[in-house]
Each structure stands twice: as structure tokens, then as C-alpha cells.
């Protein structure tokens, strides 16, 4: 596939464009160790030119329980944003908001903290998330997800209202 071809040819810019366009769909089907290996070969300077690809990779790292690597990518994303002040305000807001959404998953079972990050994302974003598919709402179509996040006896109604308010993206 394209990722292998671009890696073998050393065309890491094209590889980053594929990751960005794919938005993590293909990555989810790959062996995480392969993606980590490719990521290790990709020059940081190239990665920093593709902040959306970094965000897609951050989400993949979360899915694969590679939290230290996710946080390393977050630092690289922050450096990328600092190095590109020329980004249009709308694009910058969308990227920063997407980052907040991805980071919110680190606050599993803490609706208040997740909500804070979701609200921050909503204030910054003008488009739906690229790396997080919103079909099925915040429970991703699974009632068991609701039960994972519900934590206060008698508080379900207010928790649902809080999530509905802060999850437009």
C-alpha cells in the first residue's frame, strides 16, 4: 500500500499526506508496531509540516494505548503550531480544537474534565473533527459507553445534558 511505498522511497512528506487524508481509518487496521517503526523513521521536521497528520497519529496512539508516544506527538504538535504562525486563524482553531478533543480521551471517566476540553474545542473549531467520527453521538452508538462514563448516583440526567451541550464536534 501507499504507506509502505512512501516509506521505502523515503518520501515521508507523501506518507504524512496519506496519514492526514486517511484520518486514521487505514492506520486502525495496521499493526501498531509497524506504524511506530515508520514514525521513528520519519524526520521530526517533516512531521511538523503536517500538524493534522500528527493529530491523526495522536489518536491512533491513544487507541493503541501508547500514551507516552501520544504525549510526545502532542509536544511535536505544539512545536509545529509555534513554528507556523502563518496558519490562517480558522485552520489554527480547527487544529487546536481537534487536539483538545483527542486529549479529552485521557480523562476517561471524568465528564467534567472531558467537557472542559470539548467546550474548548467547540469554541475553536468551525468544522467537524477529522480524527474522531461522530456518528452515533458521544457514546459511539454503544450504550455500554454511557455506563463507563456515568459515575455519580442520581447524576445521569445532568451528565447527559453536559455531554450533549459540549459535543457538537
Q: Model-flagged regions — what are they?
A:
Residues 1-53, 57-60, 69, 73-76:
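Extended alpha-helical scaffolding segments used for macromolecular assembly and cargo binding
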Residues 45-169:
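Internal alpha-solenoid helical repeat scaffolds
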